[in-house]
């Protein structure tokens, strides 16, 4: 019996020690470092309006349906963050073909002047998460004609807006050149006022 207690005692102490270290101390240290070094990222990269209300995050896409605004990527989860993920159909899956055809039909309705062959792939396909906040600069540019026609904002102004909101690859190496749709639409909204 005494031998059992001598074995259990260190096990219980080690378990408790690691519970405190890994469950309390480590998370608090990492949270403190994140808040000190990169507060914006640690808080979720939130975007605020003029009234200091949260209107979104730079990291999570939103569904823009108003034809006067730029539209993001297709999302099979309708941009619901709690349902993150996508129906990652294989290229041979007929459901993928149906989904892409549906996206193309919607595109044609809203952008009749742009040939389907010029529609960038990121406007008719899902991202892996279904929450991608960015599109390619080309995907933004092909929407300029529709937006200009509906808002009466000159195409050149919209193209400059896209250029101003275009971000390069991280550290010049990682990722693609991209445009954050929420940030782009917020700048567009300023022009509409």
From Swiss-Prot:
The chain crosses the membrane at residues 14-34. The keyword Transcription does not apply. The keyword Cell membrane applies. One of its GO terms (cellular component) is plasma membrane. Keywords: ATP-binding, Cell membrane, Ion transport, Membrane, Nucleotide-binding, Potassium, Potassium transport, Transmembrane, Transmembrane helix, Transport. Pfam families: KdpC. One of its GO terms (molecular function) is ATP binding. This is Potassium-transporting ATPase KdpC subunit.
